[in-house]
Amino acid sequence: MERYIIGMGEALWDCLPEGRKIGGAPANFAYHAGQFGFKSLAISAVGDDQLGHEIREKFDQRGLEYRLETVPYPTGTVQVTLDEKGIPCYEIKENVAWDNIPYSSALEELAKNCKAVCFGSLAQRSQVSRETINRFLDAMPDTDDTYKIFDINLRQHFYCKETIENSFGKCNVLKINDE
């Protein structure tokens, strides 16, 4: 049986000067894995609001399989501006849906059938999503062909030493950007 490649964490809207664009590194990871022909899945949470419905529609249009829990928080957004050098600056909204991804028996079953998962520090800024991500990682098979990819994201104040160290201990692949 083919195992999943999963992006777990934020699914959101990047609000750019030219308009809204679907965003979230884990969701993008799952989408691109699917484009390469892998069985992929995005795991996140959205609000029961227009932006959440539009994320589902976009994922459907792109053929991205997903598990998006509907939670009583607004769908996440990020206000993106460019500095004088053209480098993106991010204002990431807090206490949004992807901060509250609930753990479930369905996620545990997905973890047991997961070949690779990409998770980040950003989605671990809240206790609910951090605990869900850690339980998912712990439920994954511990084999040489299973990959736990940690996408470290040191934006704004949304990280702490304890979460970074814990994630280093759970991952076997580290992704780092220089922006």
Describe the role of every protein-language-model region.
Residues E2-I6, K58-D60, Y66-L68, E84-E179:
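Ribokinase/PfkB-type carbohydrate-kinase core domain
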Residues G9, S44-V46, I152:
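Short beta-strand/turn micro-motifs composed of small residues
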Residues I5, D14-I87, E94-I101, S105, ...:
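Substrate-binding N-lobe of the ribokinase-like
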Residues L12-C15, F119:
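A short, mixed-charge helix-start or loop-turn motif at secondary-structure junctions
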